[in-house]
């Protein structure tokens, strides 16, 4: 009875495992791309950076506005005074109390700074464009990584299928070798070799299954899925056989997001250089203030000291700051900005050159693989027939 219960439990567990495997949802390439656009951490981080650029740009006009600051303060004194004048007169008083209140409102309006504020406003707008381009670039890279990882799983599944088919052939060879040996028509080394080949394929199957699980975990990370998420992928890789290299080369400069980001960095470096050159010019500011002060002395020892004093009023004027010598700091900053501009231009040219080389190499590999598909399929079918039928011509026994 116990044996029957154990067998029943084993059978039930096996059925549940089979159902669980078959119940894994199908993940299409479109769903994988949609998932990475929604949950990919790299894209989310760059969106946060782009939001920061947009926030800074929304306050860009503030550079043209005046600055207004208010200050106030109150001081109360309790002093003991002892004075001796030149004529010999002595004055002395204790616990002399006084109070002072000061309040001011100051305005400073920068009206000219070598047009630096205008350049900065444009620069902030260009940073918003850079943020959008970096997001697009990351989206393209993330989608490419997802597609590569997804179809690598498909490729490894096809490899696993080939291994399983080879295992079936090896199992058939083992059976045939056992039959031939049992009737005295075969040799034991042939049987041993067939078993060795079968065991080798079993080991290859385990290795391949592990590799598929590892690649799936890589895809889970790209998609933002939880570790161990189960799903199935497609069984084939679609191939576009109508790609023309001239079309790809012609649109790369204006559509390749990596090149567009590099070009935008050149624009920002040029604006930074203009900002630094503006520091050579004087700055002109309009200034104004409203001041209020009040002093209250409860007692004095000098008869000419007022017991109460109050002043208030409005003033205005203009302030000019002319840079004369600042230890060559502006010159150094201009040279640094020029070096950065040169670097960004070289980087763009390098990326443009590298992109052209990468497109050329990828297209050559694409042409090679496209030409090899038919030959590989024919060779595989021929090999499969030979393995199925050992007596077919071309089989070496």
Where would I find each of the regions flagged by the language model?
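A glycine-/polar-enriched beta->alpha junction
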Residues: 34-44, 51-67, 104-122, 133-140, ...
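Terminal intrinsically disordered/low-complexity segments used for targeting and assembly
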Residues: 1-35, 84-87, 209-247
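Amphipathic alpha-helical coiled-coil segments
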Residues: 45-60, 138, 142-161, 215, ...
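Soluble, cytosolic/nucleoplasmic coiled-coil alpha-helices used as oligomeric scaffolds and tethers
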Residues: 56, 63, 70, 77, ...
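Bacterial Sec-pathway N-terminal export signals of envelope proteins
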Residues: 23-73, 79, 187, 227-270, ...
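Periplasmic alpha-helical coiled-coil/stalk elements that build and connect Gram-negative outer-membrane
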Residues: 55, 141-253, 365, 369
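Small/polar, glycine/serine/threonine/aspartate-rich low-complexity segments that form flexible
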Residues: 71-109, 234-241, 274, 287-322
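Amphipathic alpha-helical coiled-coil segments and their boundaries
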Residues: 32, 39, 46, 110, ...
């Amino acid at each position: 009875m116990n044996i029957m219960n154990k067998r029943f439990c084993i059978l039930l567990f096996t059925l549940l495992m089979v159902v669980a495997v078959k119940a894994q949802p199908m993940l299409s390439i479109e769903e994988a791309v949609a998932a990475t656009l929604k949950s990919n951490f790299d894209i989310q981080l760059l969106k946060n950076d782009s939001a920061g650029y947009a926030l800074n740009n929304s306050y860009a006009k503030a550079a043209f506005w005046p600055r207004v600051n208010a200050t106030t303060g109150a001081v109360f004194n309790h002093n003991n005074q002892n004075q001796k004048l030149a004529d010999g007169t002595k004055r002395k008083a204790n616990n002399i109390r006084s109070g002072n209140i000061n309040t001011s409102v100051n305005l400073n309006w920068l009206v000219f700074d070598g047009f630096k504020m205008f350049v900065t406003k444009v620069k902030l707008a260009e940073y918003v464009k850079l943020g959008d381009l970096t997001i697009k670039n990351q989206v393209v890279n993330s989608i490419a990584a997802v597609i590569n990882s997804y179809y690598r799983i498909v490729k490894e599944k096809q490899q696993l299928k080939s291994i399983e088919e080879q295992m079936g052939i090896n199992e058939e060879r083992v059976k045939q070798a056992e039959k031939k040996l049992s009737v005295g028509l075969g040799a034991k080394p042939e049987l041993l070799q067939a078993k060795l080949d079968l065991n080798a394929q079993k080991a290859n199957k385990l290795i391949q299954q592990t590799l598929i699980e590892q690649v799936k975990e890589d895809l889970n990370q790209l998609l933002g899925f939880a570790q161990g998420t189960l799903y199935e992928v497609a069984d084939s890789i679609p191939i576009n056989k109508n790609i023309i290299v001239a079309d790809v080369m012609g649109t790369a400069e204006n559509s390749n997001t990596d090149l567009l980001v590099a070009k935008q960095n050149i624009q920002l470096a040029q604006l930074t250089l203009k900002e630094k050159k503006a520091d050579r010019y004087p700055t002109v500011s309009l200034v104004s203030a409203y001041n209020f002060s009040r002093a209250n002395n409860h007692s004095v020892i000098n008869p000419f000291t007022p017991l109460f004093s109050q002043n208030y009023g409005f003033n205005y004027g203009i302030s000019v700051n002319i840079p004369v010598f600042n230890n060559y700091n502006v010159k150094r900053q201009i040279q640094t900005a020029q070096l950065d501009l040169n670097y960004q231009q070289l980087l763009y040219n390098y990326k443009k050159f590298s992109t052209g080389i990468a497109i050329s190499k990828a297209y050559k590999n694409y042409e090679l693989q496209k030409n090899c598909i038919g030959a590989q399929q024919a060779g595989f079918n021929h090999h499969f027939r030979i393995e199925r039928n050992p007596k077919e011509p071309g089989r070496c026994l």
